[in-house]
Amino acid sequence: MEDLQLVLFVLGAIAIVAVLVHGFWSIRRQQPKSLKDSPMGNFYKKQAERGEGAPKRVDADGFDADGIGAVRVRKANEAHTPEAPAFNPYLKQEAKTQPQPVEPVQVEPKPLFEQEPSMAQPDFSLQSPTAKEQHRGPKASRQEPVLQGHSANLAQAHVGQSHAAMVAQKVAEEQRAQVQMPTQTALFDDEEPYEEEQSQAVEQADDDLGEPRDVLVLHVVAKEGQQLNGAELLPCFLTLNFKYGDMNIFHRHVDNAGNGKVLFSIANMVKPGIFDPDNMEQFSTQGVVFFMTLPCYGDALMNFSIMLNSARQLADDIDAVVLDGQRQPWGEFTKQDYLHRIRANA
């Protein structure tokens, strides 16, 4: 048993040594051979030793059999002089002549139309009718009516008239400013007839309605012990197609978009009777007043119907009460009185 162990120990040692030797041999074989061990390492040295006494064969250009010539040393600061190109007899080079500057030729301008000596020079040029039309320029269009100014004299308020009626009277005076059509002289003799017809139509459409003879007033007031908040009034005004404008109050125009003539307006019932849209959230009042002047633009009965419906709609939205011009509850008797006043001033 001991002999078997000894044999195995020896075999293991031999195997280990064999593996180590094989590893070193593989590593050395994979490494590149140095210049010293390479077969071409001493090639140039031996060749030089053999040819020391023998003369080297050099061709006409100074190169030996291996293509090596004499070593030439050049200075670093030596200027490089370009060599002249060799002459090629097969290429014919033509001498280039520099073009001489040519003096500019002065051409005298000639008149487009030669005039005869006997004919006098006219002061104006003759042109065709078409040319006249082109030089005439655009015709001036009719100007829109210009508001001359607002009347400064307000009608005296009646005794006992409320502040809302006074505001309505003032706004009515502003809306009934005198409208005049400026007269414009014709620039040309061939003015078209249809332009005159259009001018007359505009003048008839913009005729002044005259001084207001009556004012229809409706109040929308808060219930007892309450007030109307500006944060609630502003969206209601916009929903009813009112637009903030002149006199710092809201107006209802012919067009729902806020264009055209003013039909009726809304003012603050408390002095000074104006609104500030930028501070409506901090604004509160006891009520607002609707007013319409007579005569008015369009159908007065239809305009009053729109104003009455707007007042009722506003009262329903903000939980308020509709009153007449004397701040009395709106009823059938008051309605008939307003209709009679509308017919009287139609």
From Swiss-Prot:
Transmembrane residue ranges = 7-27
Q: Where the protein is mainly located, per its record?
A: membrane
Chain ranges on the Cytoplasmic side, renumbered to this chain: 28-346
Q: Does the keyword Membrane apply?
A: yes
Membrane disposition: Single-pass type I membrane protein
> Record's GO cellular component, any one?
cell division site
**Assigned keywords, A-Z:** Cell cycle, Cell division, Cell inner membrane, Cell membrane, Membrane, Transmembrane, Transmembrane helix
The record's annotation in Pfam families points to: ZipA_C (PF04354)
Query: Region entry Disordered: which residue ranges?
Result: 76-103, 121-145
**Which GO annotations describe the biological process of this protein?**
division septum assembly; FtsZ-dependent cytokinesis
**Annotated coiled-coil segments of the chain:** none
Q: Where in the cell is it found?
A: Cell inner membrane
Subunit structure of this entry? Answer: Interacts with FtsZ via their C-terminal domains.
Role description = Essential cell division protein that stabilizes the FtsZ protofilaments by cross-linking them and that serves as a cytoplasmic membrane anchor for the Z ring. Also required for the recruitment to the septal ring of downstream cell division proteins.
Concerning its family, UniProt says: Belongs to the ZipA family.
HAMAP family from the UniProt entry: ZipA (MF_00509)
Protein name as annotated = Cell division protein ZipA
Q: What is the source species?
A: Shewanella sp. (strain MR-7)
